[in-house]
Amino acid sequence: MSTYTYSAGPGMLPTEVMQEIQQHLLTFEYEGVSIIETSHRSASFQRVVDSLEWRLRRLMHIPENYAVLWLQGGATLQFSMIPMNLRKQNRFAYVDTGIWSKKAMEDAKHFGEVDVIHPLVDATGGMSFESSLVQEVDYLHVTLNNTIEGTRFTHIPEIDVPLIADASSNILAEQIDVERFGVIYAGAQKNIGPAGLTVVIIRRDLIQSLQLPSYLQYASHVDTLFNTPSTFSMYAAERVLKWVEDCGGVEAMERLNRQKSDRIYSYLEESTCFSPIVTGERRSLTNIPFSTGNQELDQRFERYALERGLLELGGHRSVGGLRASLYNAMPLEGAERLVDVMRAFEEETHVSHQNI
């Protein structure tokens, strides 16, 4: 019986990638020298760095007027680095779509005034915002996919200021038009690789030389390894990106993610035991919150699923309930298995209620 983890992060990695990593933990380029012992200044690791960047550029169609930076500190550090590096008038706009956008806003308040914009939901349940509210700010920040709430933007209007996107939970999982954005950033631990690595895709004209601590300046990281990076995470990410290419690229990943999420949403809509938390077009492809409507029953199902090899189905500690995260490495079989286990639990629960 296969075991699947539905964790919101770190997420699953492809089995074949982990098997290759396992081999290189003992020998990478030289016999007896591990990838985690390989110098970040060596020619062999520079090839990893170059391949990592070019694979991402190919997969996301990133043009040359954008720099690709590989940093540490998680997406959380970007909550501060973005206002630090992009401020001119010291006024920023944020679309408030949930807990992670709120965290980004709170950090931005250390560097200037924050205009809060509330999302709009249309007749189909799609999510957008009113562009006329974005005025006289240095940038507008959006969280493209809300990991906790299970929502995603379905339309982003044109605006006259740089658009900044937290893409941590949907990067490489669905197509993103990079040239719509000034900055796209993402923690690696959902769709790119292991934790410990953050990617920042930034339009070069936004990079300034500022009076900031050296690591916190984007300019310090352009086209160079400024300090010792997370070498293992970068190596693993390069292998994951190769796997994505071999699978057919981001278009293929998006098709698969739609299949997986459709399987689960379809079941939730017909179930008499479980209900989806989100309805309409704004439902996330990668993070599906759901519930029985009863905390004790939710916890019973979580234990029931764990006994059957389905891990990390608890909702975020701030909201409770249940959640299934379906990042790229989760196969279609993982979504189908979850539906089978939910259906079995529903049948057993219904029978037990009948026998009371």
Curated annotation (Swiss-Prot):
One of its GO terms (cellular component) is cytoplasm. Pathway: Amino-acid biosynthesis; L-serine biosynthesis; L-serine from 3-phospho-D-glycerate: step 2/3. Its cofactor is pyridoxal 5'-phosphate. It is an enzyme of class 2 (transferase). InterPro entries: Aminotrans_V_dom, Aminotrans_V_PyrdxlP_BS, Pser_aminoTfrase, PyrdxlP-dep_Trfase, PyrdxlP-dep_Trfase_major, PyrdxlP-dep_Trfase_small. L-glutamate binds at R41. The keyword Repressor does not apply. Keywords: Amino-acid biosynthesis, Aminotransferase, Cytoplasm, Pyridoxal phosphate, Serine biosynthesis, Transferase. One of its GO terms (biological process) is L-serine biosynthetic process. Pfam families: Aminotran_5 (PF00266). Its EC number is 2.6.1.52. It is found in: Cytoplasm. It catalyses: O-phospho-L-serine + 2-oxoglutarate = 3-phosphooxypyruvate + L-glutamate; 4-(phosphooxy)-L-threonine + 2-oxoglutarate = (R)-3-hydroxy-2-oxo-4-phosphooxybutanoate + L-glutamate. Pyridoxal 5'-phosphate binds at A75, T76, W100, T147, D166, Q189, N227, T228. One of its GO terms (molecular function) is O-phospho-L-serine:2-oxoglutarate aminotransferase activity. Binds 1 pyridoxal phosphate per subunit. Coiled coil: none annotated. Belongs to the class-V pyridoxal-phosphate-dependent aminotransferase family. SerC subfamily. HAMAP family: SerC_aminotrans_5. Homodimer. Catalyzes the reversible conversion of 3-phosphohydroxypyruvate to phosphoserine and of 3-hydroxy-2-oxo-4-phosphonooxybutanoate to phosphohydroxythreonine. This is Phosphoserine aminotransferase. The gene is serC.
